């Protein structure tokens, strides 16, 4: 949290219009939703742990946005933020999640057997498969707001829980502060570890305070099941492997995640969840499943096709560069994943990835032979 609450009380000496941020050059969801009226109504409110409206919006004020990417521009500081500041969060959620209304209910389905196919994506094109989500532990504030003691308590709880996993999930925790620069960089390059906190979104929201205190990575012995501790969320759970067997990646994801949830519940610390928002996370873009199922796929021809963007939109998929968000594609390899998080289930979201990527690989093969793909362009899903 950038400011203490005494500072927030002090700001109330000024009129709302004197404190209202200049958002004229901004392109993010928060800037679109925050009117002077909403600012006036919410600015003296705070959550039980003391998170304020100015804390919610600071990252979006400091980062006007990207000309092509619509960022969210706000964060939650605790579970109650979404309720206390709902006049701002509701329109942002509706805008970001395809019209998801304040009365809508989210659905969860972590039964991996409900996924159809997914074990036959062509490994000549699909280089790796990955599914991730975030989880927040009830009773603690979120990374933009938590204190050092709280963050360390989350780490301690997480280590105890993860160290009790057995079988294919047996593994070890590696705290960031005891890693050498080289070890850290190697893990980042292998896509196992989160980047150092250089992202302005992380910095402006206060998530990088005290770095690297109480941050770390836990992974199983095969490095196919990983948990990041105390980055943007309390926990980021990741299942990944080389090749195109998304079915196996999703099975491991569901089984491991449910084991972890069970252990936390038994310890009296369930994950934050409600039937409207699903799993409650720091960034509103991750509400719902928090799930991003993605593959690294080689699309040398399709990526140059004039309808590439339209095909992705119709399949409800999004593309990122090879190194993740805000990076370029190297050697025509794209990171393709589900665009939706809220209002549909985990199984449905991964199904869209499996079916969509399969179709795109078929299109790529046709284009290689110089054939047209016009008859393969899908309808809007």
UniProtKB/Swiss-Prot annotation:
Protein origin, superkingdom: Eukaryota
Catalytic activity: creatine + ATP = N-phosphocreatine + ADP + H(+)
Signal peptide extent: none
Residue runs in coiled coils: none
GO biological process, any: response to heat
Any one Gene Ontology molecular-function term assigned to this protein's record: ATP binding
Modified residues (Phosphoserine): 164, 178, 199, 372
Main location: cytoplasm
Keyword Cytoplasm: yes
Pfam families recorded: ATP-gua_Ptrans, ATP-gua_PtransN
Domain Phosphagen kinase N-terminal: 11-98
Entry keyword annotation includes ATP-binding: yes
Family, per entry: Belongs to the ATP:guanido phosphotransferase family.
Subunit structure: Dimer of identical or non-identical chains, which can be either B (brain type) or M (muscle type). With MM being the major form in skeletal muscle and myocardium, MB existing in myocardium, and BB existing in many tissues, especially brain.
This protein's name: Creatine kinase M-type
């Amino acid at each position: 949290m950038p400011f203490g609450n005494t500072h927030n009380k002090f700001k109330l000496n000024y009129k709302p219009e004197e404190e209202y941020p200049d958002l004229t050059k901004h392109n993010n969801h928060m800037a679109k939703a925050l009117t002077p009226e909403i600012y006036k109504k919410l600015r003296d409110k705070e959550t039980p742990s003391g998170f304020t409206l100015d804390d919610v919006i600071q990252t979006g004020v400091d980062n006007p946005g990207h000309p092509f990417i619509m960022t969210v521009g706000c964060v939650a500081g605790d579970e109650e933020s979404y309720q206390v500041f709902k006049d701002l969060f509701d329109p942002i959620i509706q805008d970001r999640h395809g019209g998801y209304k304040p009365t809508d209910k989210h659905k969860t389905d972590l039964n991996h057997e409900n996924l159809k196919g997914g074990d036959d994506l062509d490994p000549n094109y699909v280089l790796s498969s990955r599914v991730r989500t975030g989880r927040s532990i009830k009773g603690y504030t979120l990374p933009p707001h938590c204190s050092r003691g709280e963050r360390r308590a989350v780490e301690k709880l997480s280590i105890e829980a993860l160290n009790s996993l057995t079988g294919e999930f047996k593994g070890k925790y590696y705290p960031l502060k005891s890693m050498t620069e080289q070890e850290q960089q190697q893990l980042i390059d292998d896509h196992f570890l989160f980047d150092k906190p250089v992202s302005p979104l992380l910095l402006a929201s206060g998530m990088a305070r005290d770095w690297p205190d109480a941050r770390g990575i836990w992974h199983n012995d095969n490095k196919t099941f990983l948990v990041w501790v105390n980055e943007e969320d309390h926990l980021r759970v990741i299942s990944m492997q080389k090749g195109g067997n998304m079915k196996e990646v999703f099975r491991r994801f569901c089984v491991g995640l449910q084991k972890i949830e069970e252990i936390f519940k038994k310890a009296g610390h369930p994950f934050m969840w409600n039937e409207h928002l699903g799993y409650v996370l720091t960034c509103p873009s991750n509400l719902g499943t928090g799930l991003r199922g993605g593959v690294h796929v080689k699309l040398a021809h399709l990526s140059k096709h004039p309808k590439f963007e339209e095909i992705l939109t119709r399949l409800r998929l999004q593309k990122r560069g090879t190194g993740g968000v805000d990076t370029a594609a190297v050697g025509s390899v794209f990171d393709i994943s589900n665009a939706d998080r809220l209002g549909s289930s985990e199984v449905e979201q991964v199904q869209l990835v499996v079916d969509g990527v399969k179709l795109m690989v078929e299109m790529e093969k046709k284009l290689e032979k110089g054939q047209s793909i016009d008859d393969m362009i899908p309808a809007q899903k």
